[in-house]
Structures are given as structure tokens and as C-alpha cells.
Amino acid sequence: MFGLKQFYQSEVRTKLAQELDIKNPMLLPKLEKIVISVGAGAHAKDMKIMQNIAQTISLIAGQKAVITKAKKSVAGFKIREGMAVGAKVTLRNKRMYNFLEKLIVISLPRVKDFRGISRNGFDGCGNYTFGINEQLIFPEVVYDDIMVSHGMNITMVTSTDNDKEAFKLLELLGLPFAKVR
């Protein structure tokens, strides 16, 4: 397999340097980490479902998930401090590139009626976040093992603080953005 990291180092960096007119190669934007997170919502009280959500994310990411806990009690949401409210995984280096390649090549094309991911997920600091409605698009997830169907948020953190540069980086890496109408 050619590998997305090798593709980034051999082709994407040179295209970025030309298009963004950056002379110093150390200033070129790069992908630093990918965070996959799931909020349990109404299922936060059931620890078996929380364990199942964490296990599903671990299968998808290839790395153990961490169960996130509430920092404060919120009476309106019936949440107590320290209560499990979701799960997350932070991917870096080799696992990050493997996950991104699997997402682009295998998982996103399996989304029903897929026309590209939104361009509106940039936060103004060069990071991009988008949501997936269902975890079944990933080949590692077996339908019979799922207790609750849930979506997830995927955040891509880049080294740049500019949305334009981050968009160019992700576009050259092969992320299928929706066409502008």
C-alpha cells in the first residue's frame, strides 16, 4: 500500500509550497491529530451502552477509547459530576494517517446519497470538524454487536491557524468536500 503519509511527504508538500507560496518547508501546514468523539446523550446512564460505544470507537480507530466524564453537574440534563457522558480517541502519526485513508477510501463512499462533506466545519483556527450520522459505514463494525446506533464527530487538527491553508491541505490529502453551488 502506498500510504497517505508517504503521499503527503512526496506530493502534497510540494503542491502546498507552490500554491500557498511558502518558501520554508517547516512552515507548511500538516495534520497533527484526529479526534473521534461520541456523546452518549440519553444513554449516558446505562454503563453497558457506554462500554459498547467505547468498544465500537476502539474498533474503528484501532486504539483504546477513553470514556469522558462530566466536569459539572447540570440539573437540566440530569447529569452529575463525574458521570460518563461520552467516549473519545485521539489519533496521531501512523494510526492517524491509516484512519484518514480508511475514511476517505472505504467509509465515506459507503454513506448513502453521499455528495461530499461540508466546507463549513472550519473553526477559524485551521481545525476542521464534521459529523457522521451512523457508525455502520466503517467495515470493522458488525451490525449484530451494536446496542445503540450512534454517530460521531471527527476533528482534524492542523498545524496552521488559517482556514484557507487547512482547507487546501485537506483537499490535497483527498478529503471529498462538497462542490460549491
UniProtKB/Swiss-Prot annotation:
Q: Name one GO cellular component term.
A: cytosolic large ribosomal subunit
Q: Which Pfam families match?
A: Ribosomal_L5, Ribosomal_L5_C
Q: Which GO terms describe its biological process?
A: translation
Look up keyword tRNA-binding and say if it applies.
yes
Q: Care to name a GO molecular-function term for this sequence?
A: rRNA binding
Residues annotated as coiled-coil are none
Going by the UniProt record, its keywords in alphabetical order are:
Ribonucleoprotein, Ribosomal protein, RNA-binding, rRNA-binding, tRNA-binding
* Entry function: This is one of the proteins that bind and probably mediate the attachment of the 5S RNA into the large ribosomal subunit, where it forms part of the central protuberance. In the 70S ribosome it contacts protein S13 of the 30S subunit (bridge B1b), connecting the 2 subunits; this bridge is implicated in subunit movement. Contacts the P site tRNA; the 5S rRNA and some of its associated proteins might help stabilize positioning of ribosome-bound tRNAs.
**Quaternary organization:** Part of the 50S ribosomal subunit; part of the 5S rRNA/L5/L18/L25 subcomplex. Contacts the 5S rRNA and the P site tRNA. Forms a bridge to the 30S subunit in the 70S ribosome.
- Give the family this protein belongs to, as stated in its UniProt record: Belongs to the universal ribosomal protein uL5 family.
Q: What is this protein called?
A: Large ribosomal subunit protein uL5
